[in-house]
Amino acid sequence: MAAKSDGVLKMKKSDVAFTPLQNSEHSGSVQGLHPGAQPDSAGAGDADFANGESRCCGGGGSHSTCLRLSREQQKYTVWDCLWIVAAVAVYVADVGSDVWLSVDYYLEEDYWWFGLTLFFVVLGSFSVQLFSFRWFVHDFSTEDSAEAAADGSHMDGNKLLSGSASHGDVTAQHHPATPQRQASTASRNTTTNSTASTGLGPRGPKRPAYYTFCVWGSQSVIHILQLGQIWRYIHTIYLGVQSRQSAETERWRYYWRMVYEFADVSMLHLLATFLESAPQLVLQLCIIIQTHKLLAVQGCRLFIYYLLILAENAALSALWYLYRSPLATDAFAVPALCVIFSSFLTGVVFMLMYYAFFHPNGPRFGRSMSGHGLNLDPTAQFSTLPSEVATNSLRSNRGATATLERDAGKYSERDGCMPVFQVRPTVPSTPSSRAPRLEETVIKIDLCRNRYPAWERHVLDRSIRKAILAVDCSLTPPRLQYKDDALVQERLEYETTL
């Protein structure tokens, strides 16, 4: 804000946007409007407030672009309050789930994952509280400096107003006295007199020391307890309610304070997203992959997932199209919607083509998606190969009984992994008059060997060797039995590598 040499008060466009909060105590002197008076729209210039005249921000003189908001824009609705409550619920759920996950890792004695998870939680929370407290210090000190500057500029303000009044009289003599300008001059003189008598009169005492101490102490405790963001949400709701219950002259002050407070808390939430949520998501994905807890996605679940993604894209696109600015988006609105949905459809088509024609293990439709999708129920029926075909290369493994027993004892203590190949022991024959029927040992193979790297294939081969040596002392050679028809093609590979 600056004053000309002849005493005319000038304000730039950049001063208008922050006027409601910078001089919230003197709404009449800032806006240059009498309560209920209409802004003067005669003439255009460089958007200066000369002699207290009020000009519209857009330069066109329309009521929707003036500094004083319309009644609909100033009204704080219930939906605004519900959105803030939803934001609080999301924030609490986010932090609570992270803390619960850290405690779960600690109870499972995964101290490395516990430390990393808790580190990202603490890093994001402390960063957000630091920014929030820094903004509080800046706002509180700005209010104190503004009051001190206002107390020290009483005499300068009186001189400025007297110069403006004299210049207004001269202006009224030089310009034609149209009815609109006469009304504007009268309104300007009334506003100037009321401002000189009330706005620039003796101000009240400064803030007491105990009040400043209480504010600083309470804000420090709130931010130490990591509740600064929650406090700002609650303060935003309080300012919104005050903007509805206050008088007409004070309503715009609370409304603008609520808008600025909500902008601050939204920026804090954005910082928390980048500093805590995004690293936490990457960390948990790495933990899932390294601990082999990632389960295969079934076809029905995959269909439901992409259906939800399509519904979400459609809802957001529809909301954007309905509430967009027509003048700025008419040129690309429809092409943008076409690109969004065509890209989604193209991705789904390519995914289906990959699983239908280009998957390394053949078409995936109609069979299990991966080895984890196989039915591991031990009561399931197994497809049995002919005995003479499946055991041709295994007959040479028989030898002396003593040697086999010694080898079986040697291999039974090795490779303490879970049994991949289930061995069905020989059923003892019951005494009868007829000759006993020899029961053969069957080795059931449940996993596809080609789906594993070379090292894991070697581990599987050692497991099947252990199973064969453990039952090689039987009278009949063991027989391989496969659970899935897709595994039949690996029979020769098993038999040639053992």
Swiss-Prot record:
Localization, UniProt: Cell membrane
Sequence ranges of Low complexity compositional bias: 183-198
Pfam families in alphabetical order: XK-related
Superkingdom: Eukaryota
Main localization category: membrane
Membrane topology listed for this record: Multi-pass membrane protein
Keywords assigned: Cell membrane, Membrane, Transmembrane, Transmembrane helix
Transmembrane intervals: 81-101, 111-131, 302-322, 332-352
Any GO CC annotation of this UniProt entry: plasma membrane
Cell membrane as UniProt keyword: yes
Signal peptide: none
Catalytic activity: a 1,2-diacyl-sn-glycero-3-phospho-L-serine(in) = a 1,2-diacyl-sn-glycero-3-phospho-L-serine(out)
Function summary: Phospholipid scramblase that promotes phosphatidylserine exposure on apoptotic cell surface. Phosphatidylserine is a specific marker only present at the surface of apoptotic cells and acts as a specific signal for engulfment.
Family: Belongs to the XK family.
Entry protein name: XK-related protein 4
Organism of this sequence: Tetraodon nigroviridis
